[in-house]
From Swiss-Prot:
Gene name linked to the record: pyrH
Catalytic activity: UMP + ATP = UDP + ADP
Protein name: Uridylate kinase
Pfam families: AA_kinase
CDD domains, alphabetized: AAK_UMPK-PyrH-Ec
Length: 239
């Protein structure tokens, strides 16, 4: 692998990215493949932090729309992200990558509490840091948690790994005329209501001028390509 273009990155994965083709739960082959690629990125000298969603286990928003109390549903979603975080930690440590999970909700038996300075020390020592339990507050998505943590640790970029190879004008699986955007501004994303991140997360990135790159995580080698500065997917940045 070449020299990393970005020295410190925050990789945001949806929970569904861990589910593979089965669509729910955690697919061992998928998580092992992602872990192997992360190992190569860290070996190149890049510092990598992770935020993983929980949608493969529980979707708080969907549950609240069916009548469940929104705060309770969101807390359940945060616990789902912790299950994914611990699974990813296990997959990484099995292949020799030092990994720490930091939780925004206290659960000292399984994870460190989130402490910004400690997280940054781990990264400086070449460890992968996984931020679990979102922001620790209901009504905030894991996208917003990813934006917040990226700012706090001084990341150069947020890499959002999805199942499509960028941002489209419509769902490419449903609409064959959907156009892929190679580049977008934050305002274009917000005005067009594009599914990059939710509005809160996008606004946070815009206010702090943090670029977002949306790319296809299902193709092996793409994380390395993005970290090395290769132009794949869609780049979202200021004017």
């Amino acid at each position: 692998m070449g020299t990393p273009y970005y020295k410190r990155v925050l990789l945001k994965l949806s929970g569904e990215a861990l589910a593979g083709d089965q669509g729910y739960g955690i697919d061992p082959l998928t998580i092992t493949t992602i872990a192997a690629e992360i190992k190569e990125v860290v070996a190149s000298g890049a510092q990598l932090a992770l935020v993983i969603g929980g949608g493969n286990i529980f979707r708080g928003l969907a549950a609240s729309s069916k009548g469940m109390d929104r705060a309770s549903a969101d807390y359940m979603g945060m616990l789902a992200t912790m299950i994914n975080s611990l699974a990813m930690q296990d997959a990484l440590e099995k292949i020799g990558v030092d990994t720490r999970v930091q939780s925004a909700i206290a659960m000292q038996e399984v994870a460190e509490p989130y402490i910004r300075r400690r997280a940054m020390r781990h990264l400086e020592k070449g460890r992968v840091v996984i931020f679990g339990a979102g922001t620790g507050n209901p009504y905030f998505t894991t996208d917003t948690a990813a934006s917040l943590r990226a700012m706090e640790i001084g990341a150069d970029v947020i890499l959002k790994g999805t199942k499509v190879d960028g941002v489209y004008s419509a769902d490419p699986k449903k609409d064959p005329t959907a156009q892929k955007y190679p580049r977008l501004t934050y305002l274009e994303v917000l005005k067009k209501g594009l599914q990059v991140m939710d509005a809160t997360a996008t606004s946070l990135c815009m206010d702090n001028n943090l670029p977002i790159i949306v790319f296809d995580i299902t193709t092996y080698g793409n994380i390395k390509k993005v970290v090395c500065g290769e132009e794949i997917g869609t780049v979202v940045k200021g004017e």
